[in-house]
Amino acid sequence: ASFAALYMCEGSAHPLQMMHADAINDLWTNTGERGERCMVVDVAGEGQDRTVVSVWDGLHLENLYVEAKSRGPELVAIIDSMAKMEKVGRSRIVVDCDGIGGMGVADYLKGCVRFHGGGKVMTQEGDEAANFQNLRTQCYYLLAELVNSRAISINPDLSEHRVDISLELEAIRRKDDMAEGKLKIAPKEEIKEMIG
């Protein structure tokens, strides 16, 4: 089912899947709006064997670095080197701080932006209170909206990561549970289990 959904554009494999299979497939041919460059760092944590650093030019994924699990200071030096090479300032580096590894890296990368997925939902002036469980959920809903509307693109030179990226995006599911009146997504552990 995954091959047909991802590569043959035969619709979503699961009713709670947030991103349509054809929209995921189109990421490689879309033309995402260019803008400010930034880096997003997902540090290897418990059970993970790699750190992933993505480099964005607006809504276009320009580059992707996958690093073997490294110790804090060594990883910070690698990220600093990448930032210089990619011309990304510290204030444009976002570090996922949900795990211990991310917190340590962010401590060394003075001036970076710390992302706390369990944190408070973002609101803009004039918006009604958002009904998301947390910031992580809000970001996944926004990502799904951007992917499904074909607003995001991925550099075709990154095709070696195509299967991994596609499987990860396909695994993001909304929860069919509005008991607290909040939109929710499947927990990280459940998503990781689906990916395998």
PLM regions with names:
Residues D57-K182:
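Mg2+-dependent endonuclease catalytic cores in nucleic-acid-processing enzymes, primarily RNase H-like
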Residues T29-T31, T51, V105:
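Hydrophobic alpha-helical membrane-insertion segments
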